[in-house]
């Protein structure tokens, strides 16, 4: 991911790479949810109901994400990624273009979903607790969803985990393909 992060791409493909980067920075947000965001709240967070599960997520928007968001600031939506096209067309083009940005393996099989998978994998490699990773991804507790009603999860744990993951990827030298 480090190599992919530091890759320059043609301007026509930049929005697809930036959508992928935003997904990673926003804890693996799915493309349908990313394209439906409306605003960043005054507390510096985005709140959204995950399309797949309906669960409410709260994500702190880190400065690196703000930089990308500002490039694509929309009128009716937070991002203008789909304001001139349909979501399905953007999703299809994103899937096509991501595979061509770096032609050698494993990048030539890259999908948008890799951002979510990589966020979780990097988190686990950094010994971030499984419960924090699951909460960051919007998964229900592995223990008991009824218990979750009584326990308020401390979002600061996920915020700190996300910052640690971002720093791990962005502040180290990119790896070369072998």
Feature locations, PLM:
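Basic, Lys/Arg- and aromatic-enriched nucleic-acid-binding interface segment
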Residues: 1-31, 35
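Active-site/catalytic core of tyrosine-dependent DNA strand-transfer enzymes
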Residues: 1-2, 62-107
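Short, contiguous acidic/charged loop-to-helix segments that flank catalytic cores in large enzymes
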Residues: 8-11, 47-58, 79-86, 106-114, ...
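Short, polar N-cap/turn motifs at the start of nucleic acid-interacting alpha helices
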Residues: 39-45, 109, 128-149, 171-178
């Amino acid at each position: 991911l480090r190599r992919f992060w530091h890759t320059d791409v043609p301007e026509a493909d930049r929005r697809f790479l930036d959508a992928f980067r935003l997904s990673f920075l926003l804890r693996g947000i799915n493309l349908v949810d990313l394209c439906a965001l409306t605003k960043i709240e005054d507390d510096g967070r985005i709140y959204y109901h995950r399309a797949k599960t309906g669960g409410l997520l709260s994500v702190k928007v880190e400065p690196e994400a703000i930089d990308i968001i500002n490039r694509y600031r929309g009128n009716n939506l937070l991002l203008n990624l789909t304001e001139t096209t349909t979501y399905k067309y953007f999703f299809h083009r994103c899937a096509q273009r991501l595979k061509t940005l770096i032609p050698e393996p494993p990048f030539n099989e890259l999908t948008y979903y890799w951002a979510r998978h990589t966020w979780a994998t990097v988190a686990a490699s950094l010994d971030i607790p499984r419960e924090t990773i699951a909460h960051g991804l919007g998964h229900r507790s592995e223990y008991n969803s009824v218990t979750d009603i009584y326990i308020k999860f401390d979002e600061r744990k996920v915020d700190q985990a996300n910052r640690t993951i971002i720093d791990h990827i962005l502040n180290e030298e990119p790896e070369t393909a072998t």
